[in-house]
Structure formats: structure tokens, C-alpha cells
UniProtKB/Swiss-Prot annotation:
It holds the Pfam family ATG5_UblB. This is Autophagy protein 5. Its main location: membrane. The keyword Transport applies. InterPro entries: Atg5, ATG5_HBR, Atg5_HR, ATG5_UblA, Atg5_UblA_dom_sf, ATG5_UblB. Signal peptide: none annotated. PANTHER family: AUTOPHAGY PROTEIN 5 (PTHR13040:SF2). It is a peripheral membrane protein. The gene is ATG5. The lineage of its organism: Eukaryota, Fungi, Dikarya, Ascomycota, Pezizomycotina. Residues 1-25 are annotated as: Disordered.
Length: 278
């Protein structure tokens, strides 16, 4: 069973990732490119030796959206996913790929019976939190009509970039400048961190980061990283001890943070970066 992908390259398309610099690629807006990227999956059931379920899903989608199809396919309860015996959290597929860096594609996962996920509530709450971080309140998202609120989540389910953009512009085009940029940095844990770190675990660093420096110049990614994690990022200009991955590829430290958020945030509004040690 399969769904043909629009593109199975799970990396961020751009000059920083070594993607081809073709006229058509250069003319495609980055958000549209990101919405078109897909991740191929090879899913087996923990309690049944049926043929694997093969499918490609958008980077911006969620594994939980596959559960009805998987339950019907295997005829057994399906509610949780594992990668190498690590239970996966309810995060966007692309972010999970960046976190766990599967050695090969399709990504081999095991589905089974476990904790159930309410993905719609998870997405909505995360989007509200991002709105609060941006503006100091959640008035923008709370003022959306029920129709627009529903359309936002439906667009994620349907991987509909055009419909999503119509609603998302209402959230990003505010009368006042943003107070902060919603940013989360995911740092893989190791036994050396605590002595007993769970395999596959990670910690999330989330600070209030202004899109502008005190001199009103744009805040860059490098400056934000140095401010949030100075031990890992002693330089604001270049990666020295660690780098960050966004949508499968590195990002220039000189990138303006607000512009990066507007162009490459996940649909819930968060700029999610994964640390990779050098």
C-alpha cells in the first residue's frame, strides 16, 4: 500500500543543503517547497506479521493521522509509533526525522497499541502558544472565526498550503511588530548528560527571543543561538561546536530570525531546530 509522494527528498531545499540550483527550484517560494516535501515510511505492526504498510507522508503532517488507516489495514488497535524501540512523541513527521536521523529511507517504524493521541487539540494548543509568544497575548488566533480555526487544522490534515496560507496570513499580519519569535531548540540527550538518559530522549530549550536586537537591528539565528545556548554556540557567526538542522538541512547563522520564522516555521507557528554536535 502506498501514496506517491510529491517529493521524497526530506531535506530543506536551498543552497545550504546542496540541492540543485535550478531555475524552477529558485522560483518556488520556500513555504510551498516545504509543504511539498514528503517522508517515505515502512510501517509494521508489533503484534502481526502482515506485509508492511508503505506510505509517503508530508513533513508537516503527523503520524497520528495515519492511525485510522493502520487500524483498518492490520485489524488491530493502533495508537502509538516506535523507532528502534523508542516511542515517538506527537510531533510533526519532519521534526521527528530531524531528531532521530534514520539511517535509510523509507523510515522503518513499528505501530502498536499504546497511549492515544488527540492530535487536533495538540496542534491547536501549540498554535495558541505560538501566537501568545509572538504578540504577548493570543488575541490574533482567538479572534479567528470558527470557520477559519477549522480551516487551519483541515489544511494541515489535507496538506493544503494554499488554504493554510489564507488563514495563517491573518495570524502573521499584525498591526504591531512581533514581541518575540516562537523558537524551540531540541537537544538530543546522552548518558553523559545525567548518567541515565533514556535512549532517544531530548530536552527542549524555549526562551523569549526578540526579533530585534537592542539597537533595533534584526536578530539573526546565530545571535539567538549564542544567547540561548552560549556553551554550544560560542560564536554568533559560525557553528563551532554544534550546528542546527531545520527541515533536514543546516541554516546560515546570518539568517534573520523573524524572516526565518515567517518562511520556515512549522504549521503550528514554531521554529523548531535540532542540535547536531560537530
Amino acid at each position: 500500500m502506498s501514496s506517491p509522494p510529491a517529493s521524497t527528498d526530506h531535506r530543506l531545499v536551498g543552497s545550504t543543503t546542496g540541492a540543485p540550483d535550478t531555475p524552477s527550484a529558485a522560483a518556488t517560494p520556500l513555504p510551498q517547497t516545504l509543504w511539498s516535501l514528503q517522508v517515505p515510511l515502512h510501517i509494521t505492526h508489533a503484534s502481526k506479521s502482515t506485509a508492511p504498510f508503505i506510505v509517503s507522508v508530508p513533513r508537516f503532517s503527523y503520524l497520528a493521522l495515519l492511525l485510522p488507516r493502520l487500524t483498518a489495514y492490520y485489524g488491530l488497535p493502533c495508537s502509538s509509533f516506535h523507532h528502534e524501540e523508542i516511542q515517538l512523541r506527537n510531533l510533526a513527521v519532519g521534526l521527528l526525522v530531524d531528531l532521530y536521523q534514520p539511517a535509510t529511507l523509507p523510515w522503518r517504524l513499528v505501530v502498536g497499541d499504546g497511549p492515544e493521541w488527540d492530535i487536533a487539540d495538540t496542534f491547536t494548543n501549540s498554535a495558541k502558544e505560538a501566537d501568545f509568544v509572538r504578540n504577548g497575548n493570543a488575541k490574533q488566533i482567538m479572534s479567528l472565526s470558527k470557520e477559519h480555526s477549522t480551516a487551519l487544522w483541515n489544511a494541515v490534515q489535507d496538506n493544503d498550503h494554499v488554504s493554510f496560507g489564507k488563514v495563517n496570513r491573518r495570524l502573521l499580519n499584525t498591526p504591531s511588530p512581533f514581541k518575540n519569535v516562537p523558537i524551540r531548540i531540541y537537544i538530543p540527550s546522552s548518558p553523559n548528560d545525567t548518567g541515565d538518559a533514556t535512549p532517544g530522549s531530548f530536552k527542549v530549550v524555549q526562551n523569549l527571543v526578540s526579533p530585534r536586537l537592542p539597537n533595533r537591528a534584526p536578530q539573526t539565528l546565530g545571535a539567538a543561538l549564542k544567547s540561548m545556548l552560549p556553551t554550544l554556540f560560542p560564536s554568533s557567526r559560525d557553528p563551532v561546536l554544534a550546528n542546527v538542522i531545520l527541515h533536514g538541512g543546516p541554516v546560515p547563522f546570518r539568517a534573520p530570525l523573524e524572516e526565518l520564522m515567517r518562511e520556515a516555521a512549522y504549521p503550528d507557528g514554531w521554529l523548531c531546530l535540532c542540535v547536531v554536535l560537530l
